[in-house]
Each structure stands twice: as C-alpha cells, then as structure tokens.
C-alpha cells in the first residue's frame, strides 16, 4: 500500500521502560539498530498495525504495555535512491509514519524476538531516550529526531527527568529556529 505521493504508510514504536530508557533492537543479519516499525495493512488502523508490529518484532502483547500517546500526524522520510522500489503501478520513495510511545508494564522477560517466521531483531537493549537519533541509519535520523521531539513531553510526564534534557540540536530541528550551520552534519541532509 503506497499513497499517491509514493510513501508507504507505516508505524514506529518507541517502547519505554519505567526509568525512561527505550528499546533498541539490532536488525537480523545487519549491523544496524532501530526502533520497532513496520508497514500497515490496507485494512488496519495505525493502532492495530502498531500492536501487530509490536508482537511480531518483540513478542509483547497489548497487556504488557501501556499506550501513552502518538505523534499527531504522519512523519515522513525518504529512502536513499538505491532503496527506492517500484512495482507495476507505483514507486515507493519513502515511508510516512505515525509514531507511538508505549511504556512496558509487564516484565521484560516477555520480550521474545523470535515470535514471527522472519524475526526483525536478533538482540535488544535499553538505551537513553535521545541515544537513537545519532545511532540509527543515517536516512532515518531526521524522522527519529522529529518523533522523539514530539513524544518527549509525554515521556517526561510519565518518568520525570529520567529521559534527560533534549539536546539543543534536536530542539533546533523540531522548532526549525536556527540554520543548519549550527547542527550536526547529518541533520542538514534531512
């Protein structure tokens, strides 16, 4: 399912533990790490897709998490040119995502990475709330910054100061109030 602009509808999941750290998964057979995410089926709402992807990629069920909130609209990112895909009638140039913030309320032993036929992750760990922005694959850094910026106030309400102070360059991305010359090199590409 690709929209008329070439973006595939998708959901992203920021899974937070009680101390404000977030789930960070290593992709199977790749050196890359990322948040759980995945495409929506044509008959799914974003919330339904989120719970399906959560289970497929982490083994967690709705009763293991609390849904804290979501980004208010779609956040987009473009794929690098070598990853752009075409089928008979449409070209997929990127993804548009609704990002969800969840808190793990069950025991972390419920995380099982082998729940689907083709697991997404082979290892996971907890990292600080802002860590993923500079450690995800380059072309996703802008969307990660925007998603975490939009979800940070919800996270702060739940865990207090444990999520840490938003780095200045993330504030600048989110508020768009400074020129790119003040930001890390990777930001100017997005």
UniProtKB/Swiss-Prot annotation:
Residue ranges annotated as motif Nudix box: 38-59
EC number: 3.6.1.-
Molecular-function GO terms, alphabetical: pyrophosphatase activity
Cofactor: a divalent metal cation
Alphabetic keyword roster: Hydrolase
Domain Nudix hydrolase: residue ranges: 6-149
Family to which the UniProt record says this protein belongs: Belongs to the Nudix hydrolase family. RppH subfamily.
PANTHER family, per the entry: ADP-RIBOSE PYROPHOSPHATASE (PTHR43736), DIHYDRONEOPTERIN TRIPHOSPHATE DIPHOSPHATASE (PTHR43736:SF1)
Xref: NCBIfam families: PRK00714.1-4, PRK00714.1-5
Function in brief: Accelerates the degradation of transcripts by removing pyrophosphate from the 5'-end of triphosphorylated RNA, leading to a more labile monophosphorylated state that can stimulate subsequent ribonuclease cleavage.
Protein name in UniProt: RNA pyrophosphohydrolase
Species in which this protein is naturally found: Xylella fastidiosa (strain 9a5c)
